């Protein structure tokens, strides 16, 4: 187990200042948050130019004397917009494309893993079918991530397909290579 701090823990500070604050706390590694509604890294910018974003982040992280522990992105705005288990095939394809950019970003920035949100329960589909969509989508994304040498994890949360610890365990067991971020 390693102690990390999220880059968005200091949302009122610029990204570089946030990293310096984390370093001042003697926390050796940062979890990079990339959220459309977040204060620093933006998923769309990573997708547009993963190399440039990785270079910018690497310089800032190195200047602060930190390591990178993980990338924690969202595909859309919040956990309900473009969730991993969307039943819409075109949105799922867009998510896969964005994930591939996240993978390139991580490889270039020296980030060893990506933590994703596990998906939502779709009222029209119910819990079981929503869970199965998450299993299918995450199986594909884990294969992509592992193919690039990255760890892929989920963060269980309320209002998700893995709201209960037993469901989080079931999803991790159902998707070969998937891990759990606490």
For each predicted feature, which ranges?
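Short alpha-helix boundary/capping motifs
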Residues: 49-51, 89-90, 123, 134-135, ...
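N-terminal pre-domain/capping segments
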Residues: 1-112, 139, 146
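Active-site-proximal loop/turn and secondary-structure-junction residues that shape catalytic pockets
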Residues: 9-11, 34-36, 74-77, 118-122, ...
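Short N-terminal helix-initiation segments at or just after the protein's N-terminus
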Residues: 5, 96, 122-128
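Surface-exposed cleft-lining segments at the edges of enzyme active sites
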Residues: 85-91, 123-129, 154-159
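Acidic/histidine-rich catalytic cores of soluble enzymes
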Residues: 1, 19, 23, 30, ...
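Active-site groove signature of glycoside hydrolases
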Residues: 106-126, 148-154
């Amino acid at each position: 187990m390693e102690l990390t701090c999220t880059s968005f823990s200091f949302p009122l500070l610029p990204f570089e200042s946030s990293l310096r604050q984390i370093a001042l706390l003697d926390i050796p590694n940062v979890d990079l948050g990339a959220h459309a509604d977040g204060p620093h890294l933006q998923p769309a910018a990573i997708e547009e130019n993963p190399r440039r974003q990785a270079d910018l982040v690497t310089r800032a992280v190195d200047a602060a004397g930190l390591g990178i522990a993980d990338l924690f992105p969202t595909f859309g705005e919040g956990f309900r917009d473009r969730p991993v288990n969307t039943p819409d095939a075109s949105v799922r394809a867009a998510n896969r494309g964005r994930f591939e950019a996240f993978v390139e970003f991580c490889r270039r920035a020296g980030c060893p893993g990506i933590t994703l949100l596990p998906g939502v329960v779709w009222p029209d589909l119910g819990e079981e079918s929503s869970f199965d969509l998450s299993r299918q989508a995450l199986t594909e994304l884990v294969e992509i991530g592992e193919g690039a040498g990255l760890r892929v994890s989920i963060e269980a949360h309320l209002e998700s397909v893995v709201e209960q610890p037993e469901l989080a365990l079931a999803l991790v067991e159902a998707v070969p290579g998937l891990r759990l971020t606490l």
